[in-house]
Curated annotation (Swiss-Prot):
Classification via Pfam families: Cpn10
GO molecular-function terms, A-Z: ATP binding; metal ion binding; protein folding chaperone; protein-folding chaperone binding; unfolded protein binding
Function: Together with the chaperonin GroEL, plays an essential role in assisting protein folding. The GroEL-GroES system forms a nano-cage that allows encapsulation of the non-native substrate proteins and provides a physical environment optimized to promote and accelerate protein folding. GroES binds to the apical surface of the GroEL ring, thereby capping the opening of the GroEL channel.
Record text on subunit structure and interactions: Heptamer of 7 subunits arranged in a ring. Interacts with the chaperonin GroEL.
Lineage: Bacteria, Pseudomonadati, Chlorobiota, Chlorobiia, Chlorobiales
SUPFAM superfamilies xrefs: GroES-like
One annotated GO biological process: chaperone cofactor-dependent protein refolding
Protein name: Co-chaperonin GroES
Cellular localization per UniProt: Cytoplasm
Length: 95
C-alpha cells in the first residue's frame, strides 16, 4: 500500500464481513453488514492545535479498532479495500 494519511487521519483495513450466521446459514452479499472493526495500517502525524503544536495520535499501526458503521471514506488500492477516517471517528482500541 502506498498511502500516507495527512493530519489526524487514519487508514484502516476493515475486518472481513461475516460469511454465515451462527446457525450455519450463508449470508448473501446483499445481506451482509458493513464491518465496524479493523486494523490500523497507517496514521498521520497528528492534528495541529490552535497554538501551532501538533497533537500526537493515540492510535498506532497494528492496533485493532472499533468505528462507526458509516465512518470514513472507502478506497481501493492495489485491489485491497481500506477506510480513511479521522482519529475522532474511532470509538475504541480493542485489546
Amino acid at each position: 500500500m502506498n498511502l500516507k494519511p495527512l493530519a489526524d487521519r487514519v487508514i484502516v483495513k476493515p475486518s472481513p464481513a461475516e460469511e454465515k450466521t451462527k446457525g450455519g446459514l450463508y449470508i448473501p452479499d446483499s445481506g451482509k453488514e458493513k464491518p465496524q472493526h479493523g486494523e490500523v495500517v497507517a496514521v498521520g502525524p497528528g492534528k495541529a492545535a490552535d497554538n501551532g503544536t501538533v497533537v500526537a495520535m493515540e492510535v498506532q499501526v497494528g492496533q485493532k479498532v472499533l468505528y462507526g458503521k458509516y465512518s470514513g471514506t472507502e478506497v481501493t488500492v492495489d485491489g485491497e479495500d481500506y477506510l480513511i477516517m479521522r482519529e475522532s471517528d474511532i470509538f475504541a482500541i480493542i485489546g
